[in-house]
């Protein structure tokens, strides 16, 4: 979603200040040429002085404005915005990070807290000589420790996902077992933006996600889109991503909130594995599907290091189904779930798969992209679909993974939901194994699927004049 630029610089500058938490200082635009300031900003970026670079890009935009160079002014603002996103979730200095850990885990000693502040022990980066820590540092400490995670679910009195799925895995697959039935859902999505957070005039561009029709998600119906008169294209519910695109003239709205709503219904089916792993046909390596899903893409990146890791994981195994299982087990057993600062990754930019490989930290999207990258690195087509998981009582955005086998099609894998067995205080070892086995090759019907792969894009590209974006 974006706002086209028409006298919007002040709004964009305010957004940057709010994100980065540092004031904008501007030298007289006539004192230093815009190109000089821009080059100084690029030098600051290369030196890791991102705050200094932010100020220099902002100053460059002012200098370019004074010089009458609107194109370069916008580019300088875009670069400043990119830097601001580095700091959007990396908000804690060392003292604040230590206090956050102490609040969450008051029984930790000072030395124990200090260990989590060291390089490699938490998500952090350095700018202008200061280390910044991810605001989710305490949550990640819990996720990386089974005892802490199980203490949390014990206190909660519930083991999310595990409690909702595990009892039905081995139960009779009859009409009383919801895990093996189709489910029809109806939902309304509402986007409500405070009017005072938007410019007075201009065009608000909105790409609103919708469910997409695939084998396990059918009978997709878009019942309404409001305000209907501003729909430019769509609704689209076929292909690789579901969407409806709107353009809203802001000068026509004066209410306290600008509201956009979509009402949809869809039917989901469980995906249950039924194959003989000993009879997997050979891949046709010239097939367009094979070529597409075994190459690098922005967030499923195949590096020499990832390729080496993938071969270490699979060893001498040549069966692609068994190779994928080895990769699944590797991630599940050695790379625990973590919250991730995606705005920081996008700004740097760092591919999701690279971040997981290099740091050991990853949420559902990062784990799924890494699974796909490891599979692709050994010649297994793979991808990372996404949307929402809608397990009763535990709805939220979600990604998982799929790998492709000839004659069988796309095989689902959900490392993240499988890991819920490790967080469950009430899971026996046998139950945990059964639950983890289920999520390799099978998928529950509690999904709202928007896109078939992580790097699928909405139709068209945002207007190049867009300066403000919302996630």
Residue ranges of predicted features:
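Secretory targeting signatures
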Residues: 1-30, 401
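Alpha-helical segment of the N-proximal tetratricopeptide repeat
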Residues: 32-59, 63
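Hydrophobic/aromatic-rich core segments of domains that either
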Residues: 35, 39, 43, 47, ...
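Acidic low-complexity segments
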Residues: 45-48, 238-245, 252-354, 358
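Short, charge-rich amphipathic alpha-helical segments embedded
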Residues: 55-84
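Intrinsically disordered, low-complexity N-terminal segments that are enriched in acidic
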Residues: 79-272
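Active-site nucleophilic cysteine motif
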Residues: 320-327, 360-375
């Amino acid at each position: 979603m974006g706002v086209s630029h028409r006298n919007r610089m002040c709004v964009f500058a305010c957004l940057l200040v709010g994100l980065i938490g540092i004031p904008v200082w501007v030298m007289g635009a006539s004192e230093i040429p815009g190109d000089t300031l821009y080059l100084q900003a690029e030098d600051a970026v290369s030196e890791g002085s991102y705050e200094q670079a932010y100020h220099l890009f902002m100053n460059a935009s002012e200098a370019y404005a004074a010089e009458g160079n609107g194109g370069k002014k916008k580019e300088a603002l875009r670069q400043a915005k990119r830097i601001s996103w580095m700091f959007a979730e990396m908000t804690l200095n060392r003292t604040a990070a230590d206090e956050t850990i102490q609040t969450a885990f008051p029984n930790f000693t000072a030395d124990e807290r200090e260990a989590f502040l060291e390089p490699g022990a938490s998500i952090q980066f350095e700018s202008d000589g200061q280390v910044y820590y991810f605001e989710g540092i305490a949550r990640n400490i819990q996720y990386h420790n089974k005892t802490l995670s199980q203490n949390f679910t014990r206190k909660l009195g519930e083991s999310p996902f595990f409690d909702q799925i595990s009892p039905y895995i081995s139960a009779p697959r009859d009409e009383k077992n919801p895990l093996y039935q189709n489910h029809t859902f109806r939902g309304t999505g509402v986007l409500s933006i405070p009017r005072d957070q938007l410019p007075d005039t201009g065009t608000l561009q909105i790409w609103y996600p919708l469910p997409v029709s695939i084998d396990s998600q059918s009978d997709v119906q878009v019942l309404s889109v409001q305000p209907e008169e501003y729909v430019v294209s769509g609704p689209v519910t076929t292909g690789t991503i579901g969407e409806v695109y709107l353009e809203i003239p802001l000068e026509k709205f004066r209410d306290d909130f600008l509201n956009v709503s979509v009402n949809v219904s869809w039917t989901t089916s469980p995906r249950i594995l039924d194959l003989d792993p000993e009879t997997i046909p050979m891949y046709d390596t010239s097939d367009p599907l094979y070529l597409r899903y075994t190459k690098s893409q922005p967030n499923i990146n195949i590096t020499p290091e990832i390729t080496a890791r993938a071969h270490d994981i699979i060893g001498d195994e040549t069966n692609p189904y068994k190779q994928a299982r080895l990769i699944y087990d590797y991630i599940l057993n050695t790379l625990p779930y973590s919250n991730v600062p995606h705005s920081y990754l996008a700004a740097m930019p760092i591919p999701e798969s690279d971040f997981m490989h290099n740091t050991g930290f990853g949420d559902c999207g990062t784990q799924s992209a890494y699974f796909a990258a490891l599979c692709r690195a050994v010649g297994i087509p793979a991808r990372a679909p996404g949307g929402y998981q809608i397990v009763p009582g535990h709805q939220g955005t979600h990604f998982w993974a799929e790998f492709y086998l000839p004659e069988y099609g796309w095989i689902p894998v959900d490392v993240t939901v499988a890991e819920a067995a490790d967080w469950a205080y009430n899971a026996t070892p046998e139950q945990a194994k059964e639950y983890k086995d289920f999520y390799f090759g099978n998928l529950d019907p509690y999904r709202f699927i928007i896109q078939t792969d992580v790097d699928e894009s909405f139709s068209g590209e945002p207007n190049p004049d867009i300066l403000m974006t919302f996630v």
